[in-house]
A protein has these predicted regions:
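Short, well-ordered coil/turn residues at beta-beta hairpins
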Residues: 35, 89, 209-211, 313
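Short glycine-/small-residue-rich Rossmann-like dinucleotide-binding loops
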Residues: 37, 75, 91, 212-213, ...
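NAD(P)H dinucleotide-binding glycine-rich loop of Rossmann-like/cofactor-binding domains
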Residues: 86-155
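Glycine-rich phosphate-binding loop and adjacent beta-alpha segment
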Residues: 215-277, 313-317
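Adenosine-nucleotide cofactor-binding segment
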Residues: 154-157, 169-220
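Glycine-rich beta-strand-centered segment in the early N-terminal region that forms part
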Residues: 22-38, 50-92, 121
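N-terminal Rossmann-fold NAD(P) dinucleotide-binding loop
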Residues: 161-162
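C-terminal hydrophobic helical "lid"/dimerization subdomain
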Residues: 1-3, 219, 263-317
Length: 317
């Protein structure tokens, strides 16, 4: 069984290829993908070649961890059934080609326990669930740390920053301030204010959440903290982070790293989205057929007006 898939052969060398899929086992599903999202964080680092080395890293690879589709075959031990709408956070099913994280393909073979059933009415917006779960994890800490202070300042008004702000408002907490340097990204706020950093004079923030991925952000954020305040690093940083110690010492600043989402985070945001408490509207700005993936990835990574690019795989099946 073959599938069309996005393959990064090396940095900035991307194509659609026909790949042989691994055989499905008794606990596996075969899923036909309708839509997949392009990540401007992790996938951009893979595309540019700036991704820090980690176990399993290497080219060629199939990217993607934001895919939605329908089950077309289910193993005897699988709980999902044919016809179920599911979210797939990636797969490793391409033989010698690495899945990092393997979601950008027309068809996937994936372990039943790895996927999440979704309300089909979410449609293409369901590709945003991984980012929503990432935002949720930043403020929930996987339920392993209490208390966690919700953001009163968010740095970055991309999709992750918007979802973090929307989750804060949906929880009934005071609306956060959001910093964004790109004027074109100031639009789209839902119940909170977006400012240029220079227009904000506050220096008493209790919790600053950075989703910009700017490795120089600590020297910008720490002087804006109240004493005992916290900076949460919720982006992904390709370069080493450094900071001036004296301002951090004077404020007794805390620095916390938020890692990848866990299953409980996904279940929580799925319920919020399906109930309508968390809006996913207005976040997908660009669409492209999967056959045109080369141009779509370049647009996603170079056009500041592109918040989220979605590939449509339906014509490839």
């Amino acid at each position: 069984m073959k599938t069309a898939a996005v393959v990064m052969r090396s940095p900035e060398d991307l194509c659609i290829s026909s790949l042989e899929l691994d055989a499905a086992g008794d606990s596996d599903l075969v899923v036909d993908i309708d839509y997949s999202g392009i990540s401007t964080g992790t996938e951009k680092l893979l595309w540019t070649g700036r991704m820090p080395t980690f176990p399993g890293m290497g080219y060629p690879l199939v990217p993607g961890y934001e895919s939605v589709g329908r089950v077309v075959s289910a193993g005897a031990h699988a709980k999902h059934r044919v016809g179920d709408a599911v979210f797939v956070p990636g797969a490793r099913c391409f033989g010698p080609v690495r899945g990092l994280f393997g979601g950008a393909a027309a068809r996937l073979v994936v372990a039943d326990e790895r996927v999440f059933d979704i309300d089909a009415s979410l449609g293409e917006s369901a590709v945003l669930l991984a980012l929503a779960a990432t935002a949720y994890h930043a403020v929930s800490g996987g339920g392993k740390r209490h208390p966690i202070v919700a953001p009163d300042l968010i740095i970055g008004h991309g999709v992750l920053g918007r979802l973090l702000a929307r989750l804060t408002v949906a929880a009934g907490l005071p609306p956060p301030t959001v910093w964004e340097r790109e004027p074109a990204r100031h639009a789209g706020a839902m119940g909170y204010e977006v400012l240029q950093p220079e227009a904000d004079s506050r220096r008493d923030y209790r919790a600053i959440y950075d989703v910009s991925g700017d490795a120089r952000i600590l020297d910008t954020a720490i002087p804006r903290l109240a004493k005992g305040g916290e900076v949460v690093l919720a982006g992904f940083y390709a370069e080493p982070l450094r900071f001036d110690f004296a301002p951090a010492f004077m404020r007794e600043a805390q620095i916390r790293t938020a890692a990848e989402w866990q299953r409980a985070d996904m279940l929580a945001v799925k319920q919020l989205a399906e109930s309508g408490r968390l809006s996913l509207e207005g976040l997908i700005t660009h669409h492209e057929r999967a056959e045109h993936a080369t141009g779509a990835y370049r647009t996603a990574f170079t056009d500041s007006a592109c918040l989220k690019m979605v590939l449509d795989w339906r014509s490839c099946q």
